[in-house]
Regions:
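Residues in the short beta-alpha loop(s) of Rossmann-like NAD(P)-binding domains
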Residues: 44-45, 114, 138
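C-terminal hydrophobic helical "lid"/dimerization subdomain
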Residues: 78, 94-98, 140-190
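Rossmann-fold dehydrogenase core element
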Residues: 106-109, 119-160
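Short glycine-/small-residue-rich Rossmann-like dinucleotide-binding loops
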Residues: 65, 87-88, 112-113
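Beta-loop-alpha module in the N-terminal Rossmann-like domain of NAD(P)-dependent dehydrogenases
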Residues: 86-94
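Helix-to-beta-strand junctions that scaffold the AdoMet/dcAdoMet cofactor pocket
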Residues: 100-104
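N-terminal Rossmann-like NAD(P) cofactor-binding module of classical short-chain dehydrogenase/reductase
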Residues: 81-84
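Mid-domain Rossmann-like dinucleotide-binding core that forms the NAD(H)/NADP(H) cofactor-binding site
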Residues: 1-66, 70
């Protein structure tokens, strides 16, 4: 759903994903399969960025180490057309809506729910004809389209860690503390 609302265009070289965590990596694979796009991925964790690069990201940027605005402008030839934020924190909102290298008419989609507060220069949204959208869950039709994409075999394999359901609380703590790199699947083996 988030990808549909990001106004993605086939072969676009100016798409940015914020987060190289589980959802960001899944989005990367889906964007590659559905739109033939290898996006730029931004995160603050070098290990997660290595996973994103290995998964096919065109470029990876550590938000702590680089001037993101200049780097995005350089890599996208003038700004991102779409930014999809799987973190949803005050800092990532400021990066994206600030308007972090977004082209005129660009779309910023917020998926993550970390939260926080920020200040927005409202005229910059109007002057840049930019769109900010929030997405929480997709439709049944979109789920069907995603499953068809999976069945077609176009989505490349993405490694995941398998853990027993009894470790759910520990897994959530690991996720909260940034100890999970990639995806975890909780199983209930008998």
């Amino acid at each position: 759903s988030a990808l549909k609302k990001a106004n993605l265009r086939e072969n676009d070289k100016s798409v940015v994903i914020i987060s190289a965590g589980g959802l960001g990596l899944l989005a990367l694979k889906i964007i590659q399969a559905a739109y033939n796009i290898n996006p730029i991925v931004v995160d603050i964790d070098d290990e997660k960025l290595k996973l994103a690069k290995a998964a096919g990201a065109a470029e990876v940027i550590n938000a702590k180490d680089e001037n993101i605005y200049e780097k995005i402008m350089e890599l996208t030839d003038g700004g991102a057309t779409s930014v999809i934020d799987y973190v949803g924190a005050g800092d990532t909102f400021e990066l994206a809506s600030g308007m972090f290298g977004m082209k005129r008419g660009g779309t910023y989609v917020i998926v993550g729910l970390i939260g926080g507060q920020t200040t927005v220069q409202i005229p910059m949204i109007a002057l840049g004809a930019r769109t900010i959208r929030g997405v929480y869950v997709g439709s049944l039709k979109e789920m069907g389209e995603l499953m068809e994409l999976v069945r077609s075999g176009k989505i490349d394999h993405l490694d995941f860690e398998k853990r027993d359901i009894s470790t759910a609380n520990e897994t959530l703590n690991d996720l909260k503390n940034g100890k999970i790199h990639g995806l975890v699947c909780l199983t209930h083996d008998h």
